[in-house]
């Protein structure tokens, strides 16, 4: 699959089943994804892979914090077992030389590149954030350290047959593009200066 096809056809897959990449295949795909833009080559991220019952613990931690009743606790436990692999992306800023916002952008680029690589190998994925990413209990369960924070969890598996979503038509983005010379004509501080003659 070429890159443009991967970008145009990737979708968030809500229904995922086995197989998912094993640890070796995940590491292989991550090696490719880690070539995403990363000023200073800091790799300000790490991934924690959760399989089997480990995934249910994410929902149980959220349920505990929110004081959920038994039915809600069960629903949250099930919610985080919808995929055979959950990969938690931990943002781990490194030093002050590269601004933290650039390091955060690098971690985000890695996640997107990984999703495209998974799609190219016929895996599905969906990016989950919300309460999961901000839960102190989930952070403790995952062993976050110091300034680390959870950006989200990527659920990974094989899409269910027959759940292919219709292809989206790319939006017209021309209104978001401005040529600088067009912009400069309307700004007095960039207008050409008359030469003395």
Predicted regions and their residues:
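N-terminal amphipathic, basic helical "cap/leader" segment at the start of enzyme domains
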Residues: 1-82, 185-197
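Active-site-flanking beta-strand signature of metal-NTP-handling nucleotidyl enzymes
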Residues: 86-90
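Generic beta-strand structural signal
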Residues: 85, 121, 149-152
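Short, charged/polar surface micro-motifs in flexible loops or helix N-caps
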Residues: 52-57, 64, 93-96, 136, ...
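C-terminal helix-cap and adjacent tail motif
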Residues: 5-12, 150-197
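Short, histidine-centered active-site or binding-site loop motifs used for metal coordination
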Residues: 11, 91-94
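Short, electropositive alpha-helical surface patch
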Residues: 138-151
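Small-aliphatic-rich amphipathic alpha-helix that forms the alpha element of a beta-alpha
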Residues: 33, 95-141
